[in-house]
Curated annotation (Swiss-Prot):
It is found in: Cytoplasm. Keywords: Cytoplasm, Ribosome biogenesis. The keyword Cytoplasm applies. Belongs to the RbfA family. NCBIfam families: rbfA. This is Ribosome-binding factor A. Monomer. Binds 30S ribosomal subunits, but not 50S ribosomal subunits or 70S ribosomes. GO terms for molecular function: ribosomal small subunit binding. Signal peptide: none annotated. GO terms for cellular component: cytosol. InterPro entries: KH_dom-like_a/b (IPR015946), RbfA (IPR000238), RbfA_dom_sf (IPR023799), Ribosome-bd_factorA_CS (IPR020053). It comes from the Bacteria. One of its GO terms (biological process) is maturation of SSU-rRNA.
């Protein structure tokens, strides 16, 4: 009988949970926006963990690119600290090296949603005007 989750999936899930708590509680850098850890992918040999995050910086909501770059730099500089804290929380022989990546899927989904709404509004206004012209 096959297992539902592999060991790598369980390790990645545990790293994601612990890392989200550590970032929220331990990192106090003002350049760091509200960071959400979306997913973690662990290499087969557990040497690397690719951490995908999204950033909401309330000061720079319009200028999302600069805020996310600054937050990524903060996370990259704190990677050693976060790795050592993860080592205390999760018992592994080797704690993976953390590599942070900006996950653009959320912002892409918002942009696509806005485009769909815009297209629907345009279609409904076009159908309303064509209905008026036929009457």
């Amino acid at each position: 009988m096959a297992r539902e989750f592999s060991r790598l999936d369980r390790v990645a899930e545990q790293i994601q949970k612990e890392l989200a708590q550590l970032i929220q509680r331990e990192l106090k850098d003002p350049r760091l926006g509200m960071v959400t850890v979306n997913s973690v992918k662990v290499s087969k040999d557990l040497s690397y963990a690719d951490v995908y995050v999204t950033v909401l910086n309330l000061k720079d909501v319009e200028d999302d690119g600069d805020a996310s770059k600054a937050s990524l730099k903060v996370l990259e500089s704190a990677a050693g600290f976060l790795r050592s804290e993860l080592g205390r929380a999760i018992k592994l022989r080797v704690m993976p090296q953390l590599r942070f990546h900006y996950d653009a899927s959320v912002s892409n989904a918002q942009r696509l949603g806005a485009l769909i709404q815009k297209a629907r509004a345009k279609d409904s206004s076009a159908s309303d005007s064509s209905d008026d012209s036929h009457n």
